[in-house]
Amino acid sequence: MALIEAVSASKIYRSGDVEVAALSDITLSIEAREFLAFVGPSGSGKSTLLNLVGCLDHPSSGTVTVMGTNVAALNRTASAAFRGEHLGFVFQEFNLVPVLSAYENVEYPLLMVRNWPADKRRTQVMKMLDAVGMAEQAHKRPDQLSGGQKQRVAVARALVSEPQLVLADEPTANLDHATAHKVIALMKQMRDEFGTTFVFSTHDQKIMEAAERIVMLEDGRIVKEQRA
């Protein structure tokens, strides 16, 4: 069974009498351990598809199944529990907790979904912060960090619990060239070591070059797929 399965999935947004089809009749299978990128122009449906795969939204019609679970069958509480247990996210807006330090932001998923002792948590948090070059900034709050530094903390937070699936919306958007390559290498290392599946929404050529499968969207439809 595929890790992710979309069958004739569509997403329609309504505003009064106006309907906008963000996604139309998407059928797609993603296997475990894939390193895959959704690409396409702004408004093509990349982020909407990522939201469906990440149990952040439900399709208007059709089905999206993640790890054997039909996402439309989950209520809000069950969706949150499923995401916390199995998924990691990197958002363009970072979504860091402003009153927590970088260390505490990265530790947060472990406190929520992993019953690890404090010493194991600390080792894992510092390992991830060091991997993204942020160990020396661990004590700083988000308002004391640059955009690129916040992005690195967000990446560390997404990876810290060693999730089965990581969904990343433009994860390298605020990173310099060298750091972006380092982050991509870290993600591939996690895929190789832990079998993590990575799905990206991106315009970044560096991620497109690293991806082993590219799914191209246009006007809410898949128009082309290619493998490395």
Say what each PLM segment does.
Residues 214-226:
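H-loop (His-switch) and adjacent beta-strand-loop-beta switch element
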Residues 2-217:
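ABC family nucleotide-binding domain
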